[in-house]
Amino acid sequence: MRLHLLLLILLLFKILLSPVRGDLGPVEGHCLNLSGVCRRDVCKVVEDQIGACRRRMKCCRAWWILMPIPTPLIMSDYQEPLKPKLK
């Protein structure tokens, strides 16, 4: 009985103390899975924009002519705020 209790407690601690990457959102994780980098405002000259990470962050990935890799466009839930119309 004590062995079962000990195993149950160890399993509980393993579940509760498991490493969790909570700092990345789903779009940032998808960008990293495509070998991309989230950059602020603009991508470098040798990079293509393959999506959006956050408000002003863009998912950028280096393009290589010799090794083309298809990249799906990453759509973000964020929409730019409407600009006020001047009357």
From Swiss-Prot:
Entry-listed glycosylation sites: N33
Keyword Cytoplasm: no
Main localization, broad class: secreted
Keywords on record: Disulfide bond, Glycoprotein, Secreted, Signal
Cystine crosslinks: C31-C59, C38-C53, C43-C60
Compartments where found: Secreted
Signal peptide boundaries: 1-22
Family stated for the protein in its record: Belongs to the beta-defensin family.
Protein's UniProt name: Beta-defensin 109D
Species name: Homo sapiens (Human)
